[in-house]
């Protein structure tokens, strides 16, 4: 059969349209995040200006507990060695709204989203791309999802639905060949300030979202100031305060989950490279939020092969815990904001 030029042209157009549709639906590792930025509304705790917040009455004691000479460390970077599966920092995945949802079996199902809490059954909820099963670098630590490292690594998987501005975060993931497993999982609508219910975890020990508190390459080297706080870990914690919702320790003298540290305004940033000054300015204005137990004064950021740790490590190491103050525990910029805890775990059929 001889096809007309018009029919051949139509066929080409159809193929192009289909190809573009597939491309649009493709999951992207460390893809472009949906605006407006920063993530979450301006009134969110991650985006609150704490430069004028009052000091905590025990600020000096908390800093002493950490160790006044304890140096900061950037807990992020690129590959452990060129071409290796192992990575430093948090990868994140950007998908579109049509990404198929997967059910996840949880160790802490009673505090996780994507679960019918009447029957305790997981439901299709998390838009996990298939690439995370066998591809390196899609999950924290770097190894693919079908490698079981749950006993030795946190294995976070962070997913952003760019069309709906939804954030899905999973802790301690593993794909067993049939289905996904995780320690816990949380959903955050980036359009609103939905806090986890008190005593509930998320994919992070404090019950907070992870991605909004990461040092990101695109922000550090972009034209604008960084307008959010950063996630920080300390070796021990004692309870929790707003904005956290979950405890993971009761060590006397330690900071609570959700505590905020602020780089002193008197700390001179002269001599640091421009991109480092930008990071440190954000620490002065937005501070750090204690979100997990780990190494003292480790600042969380994204995995990105463009990071240069020969620059980052000594720059961060020039700051010590004594360069920071602890602001008043539970402080909020405006009383009552952003509202009472919101249960985001309700699913259809519950």
Language-model segments: residues:
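Short, surface-exposed polybasic-aromatic patches that bind anionic ligands, especially phosphate groups
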Residues: 27-335
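Low-complexity, intrinsically disordered regions enriched in charged/polar residues
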Residues: 23, 40, 338-340
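Intrinsic disorder/low-complexity segments in short proteins, especially the signal peptide
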Residues: 23-25, 349
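Pro/Thr/Ser/Gly-rich low-complexity, intrinsically disordered linker/stalk tracts
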Residues: 336-350
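N-terminal secretory signal peptides that target proteins for export/translocation
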Residues: 1-6
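Bacterial N-terminal signal peptides
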Residues: 12-21
């Amino acid at each position: 059969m001889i096809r007309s030029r018009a029919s051949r042209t139509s066929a080409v157009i159809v193929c192009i349209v289909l190809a573009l549709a597939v491309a649009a639906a493709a999951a992207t590792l460390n893809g472009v995040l949906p605006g407006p930025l920063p993530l979450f509304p301006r009134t969110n705790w991650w985006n609150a200006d704490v430069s004028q917040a009052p000091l905590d009455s025990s600020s000096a004691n908390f800093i002493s507990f950490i160790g006044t000479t304890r140096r900061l460390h950037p807990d992020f970077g690129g590959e452990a060695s060129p071409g290796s599966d192992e990575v430093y920092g948090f990868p994140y995945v950007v998908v579109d709204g049509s990404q198929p949802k997967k059910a996840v079996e949880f160790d802490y199902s009673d505090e996780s989203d994507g679960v019918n809490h009447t029957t305790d059954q997981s439901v299709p909820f998390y838009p996990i791309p298939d690439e995370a099963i066998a591809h390196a670098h899609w999950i924290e630590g770097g190894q693919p999802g079908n490698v079981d490292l749950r006993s030795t690594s946190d294995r976070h998987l962070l997913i952003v639905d760019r069309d709906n501005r939804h954030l899905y975060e999973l802790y301690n993931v593993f794909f067993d060949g049939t289905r996904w497993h995780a320690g816990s999982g949380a959903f955050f609508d980036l359009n609103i300030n939905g806090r986890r219910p008190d005593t509930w975890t998320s994919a992070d020990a404090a019950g907070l979202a992870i991605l909004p508190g990461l040092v990101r390459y695109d922000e550090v080297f972009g034209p604008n100031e960084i307008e959010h706080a950063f996630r920080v870990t300390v070796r021990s914690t004692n309870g929790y305060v707003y904005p956290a919702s979950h405890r993971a320790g009761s060590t006397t003298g330690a900071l609570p989950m959700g505590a905020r540290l602020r780089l002193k305004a008197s700390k001179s940033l002269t001599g640091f490279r421009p991109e480092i000054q930008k990071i440190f300015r954000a620490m002065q204005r937005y501070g750090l939020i204690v979100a997990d137990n780990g190494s003292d004064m480790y600042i969380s950021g994204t995995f990105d092969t463009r990071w240069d740790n020969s620059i980052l490590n000594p720059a961060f190491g020039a700051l010590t815990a004594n360069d920071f103050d602890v602001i008043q525990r539970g402080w909020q910029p405006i009383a009552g904001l952003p509202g009472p805890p919101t249960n985001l775990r309700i699913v259809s059929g519950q």
